[in-house]
Every structure is written in structure tokens, then in C-alpha cells.
Design a protein with these regions (language model features):
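Terminal amphipathic alpha-helical/low-complexity segments used for targeting or macromolecular assembly
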Residues: 1-49
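A detector of tandem-repeat and repeat-rich interaction/domain scaffolds
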Residues: 47-119
């Protein structure tokens, strides 16, 4: 069962890629059906399993994936081939990119950047 859908609302990121606002279809975690989330490029960026969610003005693009119970919010960005999973939280103006992985109970926030092959 799908937990979210892409809406027709979109923004265009600095590299010209269209990112679509997401909308919750069911209740899970702290998310209620009908809640609007952040922006993703494609459905594959956010898992339909677990409580993972992207909210506020957060952006997920490229081949990046958010799954498990991970949360990305605020103005955070996850892109490239990066993964955010487990109970990890990425928020504020933080960026995760490249082949980086943020997982477990890790928190990346403020203006922090995790990139390259970091994990």
C-alpha cells in the first residue's frame, strides 16, 4: 500500500530538476492522511515502508533514498546517491550528498554537510 503520492505542486531546484510536493495517503508515525510533506524528484526517493518522511521544505533528489524511520525536514537536502535510513534525522539547512549514508540514530543539522563516501 502506498503511503504518499506526488502532488501537482512543484519547485525547480538550482540544477533545473523538478521536485514535487508529497501528500500522505494514510496515517503513519506522526503523519496524518492528507498531510503535505516536502519535495521529492520521484517516488523512489522515499520508501512506502516504515515511518520515513520528508516534510517542510526539505528536498530529496537524484538517486537519493530516505527509508526506514528516517526523517528529513526543515530546509535539509539529500541528493546524489545518498541514503538516510534507520532512525536518522536530517534537518535545518543540512545537506547529505554523494554516496554518503546517514543511519542509526544519527542527527545531521544546522549547516552541516555530509558528502562523498562518508558514513
Amino acid at each position: 500500500m502506498k503511503k504518499f503520492k506526488l502532488t501537482s505542486e512543484f519547485i525547480v531546484d538550482i540544477s533545473g530538476v523538478k521536485l514535487f510536493r508529497i501528500k500522505a495517503l494514510i496515517e503513519f508515525g506522526n503523519v496524518k492522511a492528507g498531510d503535505l510533506g516536502g519535495y521529492i524528484e520521484k517516488e523512489e526517493n522515499l520508501s512506502h515502508m516504515g515511518d520515513a518522511w520528508v516534510s517542510d521544505d526539505a528536498r530529496i533528489s537524484g538517486n537519493a533514498q530516505v527509508f526506514g524511520n528516517a526523517q528529513v525536514f526543515g530546509n535539509a537536502q539529500v541528493f546524489g546517491d545518498a541514503w538516510v535510513f534507520g532512525n536518522a534525522r536530517v534537518f535545518g539547512n543540512a545537506r547529505v550528498s554523494g554516496d554518503a549514508q546517514v543511519f542509526g540514530d544519527a542527527q545531521v543539522f544546522g549547516d552541516a554537510q555530509v558528502f562523498g563516501d562518508a558514513w
